[in-house]
UniProtKB/Swiss-Prot annotation:
Name of this protein: Large ribosomal subunit protein bL32c
Gene Ontology CC, one term: chloroplast
Designated gene of the protein: rpl32
InterPro entries: Ribosomal_bL32, Ribosomal_bL32_plant/cyanobact, Ribosomal_zn-bd
Domain of life: Eukaryota
Subcellular location: Plastid, Chloroplast
GO biological process, one term: translation
The keyword Ribonucleoprotein belongs to this UniProt entry's keyword annotation: yes
Length: 57
């Protein structure tokens, strides 16, 4: 099994963690933006099937 020879520096650890967090926050912003456009009906890339409501006589 591969074992690292030296300890990873704290600055490198922080840089990697910040990149990981930034990637997650960008994905969250993108998902929220898509949800907003779908809910307002302004989405051009998503088609939401509308259900027809049948009235009973």
């Amino acid at each position: 099994m591969a074992v690292p020879k030296k300890r990873t520096s704290m600055s490198k650890k922080h840089i990697r963690r910040n990149l990981w967090k930034k990637k997650g926050s960008l994905a969250a912003v993108k998902a929220f933006s898509l949800a907003q456009s779908i809910s307002t009906g302004q989405s051009k890339s998503f088609f939401v099937a509308q259900k027809k409501v049948l009235e009973k006589s």
